[in-house]
Swiss-Prot record:
Annotated Basic residues bias: 178-193
Source organism of this protein record: Mus musculus
Lineage, opening ranks: Eukaryota, Metazoa, Chordata, Craniata, Vertebrata
Gene responsible for this protein: Tspyl2
Compositionally skewed regions (Acidic residues) per UniProt: 543-581, 606-627
UniProt biased composition (Polar residues): 484-493, 526-540
Stated name of the protein: Testis-specific Y-encoded-like protein 2
Function recorded in the entry: Part of the CASK/TBR1/TSPYL2 transcriptional complex which modulates gene expression in response to neuronal synaptic activity, probably by facilitating nucleosome assembly. May inhibit cell proliferation by inducing p53-dependent CDKN1A expression.
C-alpha cells in the first residue's frame, strides 16, 4: 500500500522469486524529498513511544515492505546498509534548507557532537535497512533513540535466515574489560603463588639435603675412627696370636704329610689337587699366611718345601694386594721347575686335563682365584687340625685302635689282695671303664688347636690341654725318665692327657703299714689306684705311649700328706703341683713368660719322639704287640699270685711292703703295651 506522499519503499526480494540475485547492481537513487510540516513539540512522541512505534514497525516487516520514517529525514547508504536520519526542527544542526530538497547528508560525527542536555526537546531516530544480497531476502532493522540508552533489538520472524544486529553500549565494554582484568589478575596471582610454592619446596628440599649431608659426614668420621680402632685391635691380636702360631708351626713341621691331608680333606680345595699335586705336597713342610705392612692392603701366602725332584724353589709366595678400585690383584713368585716336570709337559704325557693347584698358584687370571685364596686364609689356615682329623690322621687311627682293643677284651683285670671275688671286680671295672670312656671322649673331642685364633676365651682351656698332652707324650718316651714303683697317684680327672707335673698325694693312698687294718687300707688304696691308673692307661691307648710309671722315685716316697713339691726328676718343673694353673698364670703375665716356660719344658727331641708316636708305623707295631701284651699280663698274674701265696705267711712290716710292691710292677709291665689286663 504505497502512498504518494511517502518516500519510495525499499525493494525487498521475495523468497519465492526464482530470479537470480543481483549482488553487483548499484543501489537505486534516493526518492525525492517532500516537505511536510513538523508537529509541535507537545505532539511529538516520547522516547518510549518511539520505541513502541519502532517495535510495531518491526512487527509489520513480515506483512509488507518497510516504510521509511516520517519526513524530514536524511538517507545515508554505505556497505549495503541504508540509514534514515530524522531530525526535529529545534535540534541543533537542523538546516531548514533541507526542507526543500535532499540537502547534504549530515556528517557522521553528528551523533557524537550532540550533547545529552540538548536532546530533551527533540529526538533523533535512526533506522537501519540492511540490503544484503541473500537468497532469503531477510532484512534487519534496528531503531535507536538518544532518549533510550539501552540497546534495542528489532526482532523479526523466527527464521534460520534472520540477521540480527546487536548494538552494545560502553558499559558492557567496561564490564568486559573489568572481567578480563580480573581474570588476568587471578591468573597472575595463581602463577605467583605457584612460583612461591616451588621456591619454598626447593628451599625445604635444600635444607633437608644439607642436614642429610651433615649427618653423612659425621657418619663417615665415625667410620674412619672405627676403621682405625679395628686395625689397631687387629694388630694387637696378631701380636697375641704370634707365639701360638709359631708353636703350632713347630709342631706341624714334624708331622709327616700333615698339610697334604689337610688340603685333601678340605671339600673346596681338594678339587684343585690332582695326583701329581699330592706327590708334590708330600714335601710341603709349612704354610704361612701373613698380612702386608698395612693390613688393609692385602696379604700373602708362603709355602715351604723340602728339597724335591719337581722344582728348585724352597719357598713359593703368592701375594694378594688391593688396587685403587678395591679389587685383589695377585702376584706370585715364578716356580723353577726341573726339566720335564712342568705342568704342561705332565698334562701332555698323562693326558690329565683336571685342574691343578700349581696352575692356580701361577695363573692370575682365574675368576675363582680370589675365592680360593680367601678359603685358604680364613678357613684352612685358621684351623688346619680340623681338616687333618676329618678323614684319616691321628683321631681316626686312635678310634680304630681303641675299637679293636674293645673287641678283644671284654673285661679288665687288676691285681688286688681279694681278687678271688671276680664278679665284684667285674662290676667295679665295668663302671670305671664307662666313666673313663665318657670322660675321654668328651675331652678328646674338645681339642681344637687353632680355635684360639678366633676367640680369646678359648686360650686358657684348649691350649693348656694341648700343652699337657704334648708334654705327656714327650716325657713318656724320654729315655732319661726313670721307671720305678709309685705308691702316690696322680689326679687326672680334669685334664685331657696325664701330666707328670700334676702329681699330688691322695689321702686314701697314705699307707703306714703299722696297723692291723693294713689289708683294708691296701684294698682302698688299690681301688683308688685302679681308678687313676685306669684313666692313665686309657689316655695311653689314645696317644700310643708308654707311661706306666707316673709317680715319683723311691727316694721321695716318704708318706707325708703335706708334700706339695713335684715328683718328677726334672728340676725345672718342681715349682708347684698344678701345671694348668701355672700355664694360665704364664699367659696372663704375657707371651714372653709363656714362651720361656715353653722352651724350658719342650725341646726338639721331644717333638721328634711325638712324631714317632703319631706316625702310622707305631700304630701297626702296637697292633702286633697287643696280643703279646695280653699273654704277658696273664703270665705275670699267675706268677704274682703264686708269689703272693708263698709270702702270705710273713706278718712283719717288711713283708707287707714286699707284698704290696709287686702290684705296681705288674701295672708297669702292662702299661707299657697300652693294655690293662
Amino acid at each position: 500500500m504505497d502512498r504518494p506522499d511517502e518516500g519510495p519503499p525499499a525493494k525487498t526480494p521475495r523468497l519465492s522469486s526464482s530470479e537470480p540475485r543481483q549482488r553487483d547492481l548499484p543501489p537505486p537513487p534516493p526518492p525525492p524529498l517532500q516537505r511536510l510540516p513538523l508537529p509541535p513539540p507537545q505532539q511529538r512522541p516520547r522516547p518510549q513511544e518511539e520505541t513502541e512505534a519502532a517495535q510495531v514497525l518491526a512487527d509489520m516487516r513480515g506483512v509488507g515492505p518497510t516504510l521509511p520514517p516520517p519526513l524530514p529525514y536524511v538517507i545515508l547508504e554505505e556497505g549495503g546498509i541504508r540509514a534514515y536520519f530524522t531530525l526535529s526542527a529545534e535540534s541543533p544542526g537542523w538546516d531548514h534548507a533541507m526542507e526543500s530538497g535532499f540537502g547534504e547528508a549530515p556528517s557522521t560525527g553528528i551523533m557524537e557532537t550532540l550533547p545529552s542536555s540538548e536532546i530533551s526537546g527533540g529526538s533523533l531516530a535512526i533506522d537501519f535497512q540492511v540490503a544484503e544480497p541473500s537468497s532469503l531476502g531477510e532484512k534487519a532493522l534496528e531503531t535507536c533513540s538518544l532518549g533510550g540508552w539501552g540497546p534495542q533489538m528489532l526482532v523479526g520472524p523466527k527464521r534460520k535466515e534472520e540477521a540480527i544486529i546487536i548494538v552494545e553500549d560502553e558499559d558492557e565494554d567496561d564490564k568486559e574489560s573489568v572481567r578480563r582484568r580480573q581474570r588476568r589478575r587471578r591468573r597472575r596471582r595463581k602463577q605467583r603463588k605457584a612460583k612461591e610454592s616451588r621456591e619454598r619446596s626447593a628451599q625445604r628440599m635444600e635444607s633437608i639435603l644439607q642436614a642429610l649431608e651433615s649427618i653423612q659426614m659425621d657418619l663417615e668420621a665415625v667410620n674412619i675412627k672405627a676403621g682405625k680402632a679395628f686395625l689397631r685391635l687387629k694388630r694387637k691380636f696378631i701380636q697375641m696370636r704370634r707365639p701360638f702360631l709359631e708353636r703350632r708351626d713347630l709342631i706341624i713341621q714334624h708331622i709327616p704329610g700333615f698339610w697334604v691331608k689337610a688340603f685333601l680333606n678340605h671339600p673346596r680345595i681338594s678339587i684343585l689337587i690332582n695326583q701329581r699335586d699330592r706327590d708334590i705336597f708330600r714335601y710341603l713342610t709349612n704354610l704361612q699366611v701373613q698380612d702386608l705392612r698395612h693390613i688393609s692392603m692385602g696379604y700373602k701366602m708362603k709355602l715351604y718345601f723340602q728339597t724335591n725332584p719337581y722344582f728348585t724353589n724352597m719357598v713359593i709366595v703368592k701375594e694378594f694386594q688391593r688396587n685403587r678400585s678395591g679389587r685383589l690383584v695377585s702376584h706370585s713368585t715364578p716356580i723353577r721347575w726341573h726339566r720335564g716336570q712342568e705342568p704342561q709337559a705332565y698334562n701332555r704325557r698323562s693326558h690329565d686335563t683336571r685342574e691343578s693347584f700349581f696352575n692356580w698358584f701361577s695363573n692370575h687370571s682365574l675368576p675363582e682365584a680370589d675365592r680360593i685364596a680367601e678359603i685358604i686364609k680364613n678357613d684352612l689356615w685358621v684351623n688346619p687340625v680340623r681338616y687333618y682329623m676329618r678323614r684319616g690322621g691321628y683321631r681316626s687311627s686312635r678310634k680304630k685302635q681303641h675299637g679293636k682293643e674293645r673287641a678283644k677284651n671284654q673285661y679288665e683285670m687288676v691285681i688286688m689282695e681279694d681278687a678271688h671275688d671276680h664278679y665284684a671286680i667285674e662290676d667295679i671295672l665295668s663302671d670305671i671303664s664307662e666313666i673313663d670312656e665318657i670322660t675321654d671322649n668328651e675331652t678328646i673331642h674338645d681339642i681344637k688347636i687353632s680355635d684360639f685364633m678366633e676367640t680369646t676365651d678359648y686360650f686358657e682351656t684348649t691350649d693348656n690341654e694341648v700343652t699337657d698332652a704334648n708334654e705327656n707324650l714327650c716325657d713318656s718316651e724320654n729315655p732319661d725318665h726313670s721307671e720305678g714303683y709309685n705308691t702316690k697317684i696322680t689326679d687326672n680327672k680334669g685334664s685331657v692327657a696325664a701330666n707328670p707335673d700334676d702329681n699330688s698325694d691322695d689321702p686314701e693312698e697314705k699307707n703306714t703299714y703299722d696297723s692291723e687294718d693294713s689289708n683294708s687300707e691296701k684294698a682302698d688304696g688299690d681301688n683308688t689306684t685302679l681308678r687313676d691308673n685306669q684313666q692313665v692307661t686309657n689316655i695311653q691307648d689314645s696317644s700310643d705311649s708308654d707311661n706306666g710309671d707316673e709317680g715319683s722315685d723311691d727316694e721321695d716316697d716318704d708318706g707325708n700328706e703335706g708334700d706339695n713339691e713335684g715328683s718328677d726328676d726334672d728340676d725345672d718343673d718342681n715349682e708347684g703341683s698344678d701345671d694348668d694353673d701355672r700355664d694360665i698364670r704364664y699367659y696372663k703375665n704375657g707371651p714372653e713368660v709363656f714362651d720361656k716356660a715353653l722352651d724350658n719344658r719342650t725341646n726338639q727331641n721331644d717333638y721328634e719322639e711325638e712324631v714317632e708316636l703319631i706316625s702310622e708305623d707305631s700304630v701297626e707295631e702296637e697292633e702286633e704287640t697287643s696280643e703279646e701284651a695280653s699273654q704277658l699280663s696273664e703270665d705275670s698274674y699267675e706268677d704274682e699270685r703264686i708269689y703272693g701265696e708263698e709270702r702270705s705267711e710273713v706278718n712283719s712290716e717288711d713283708s707287707d711292703i714286699q707284698e704290696v710292691l709287686p702290684v705296681p710292677k705288674a701295672w708297669a709291665s702292662l702299661g707299657k703295651k697300652g693294655k690293662i689286663g
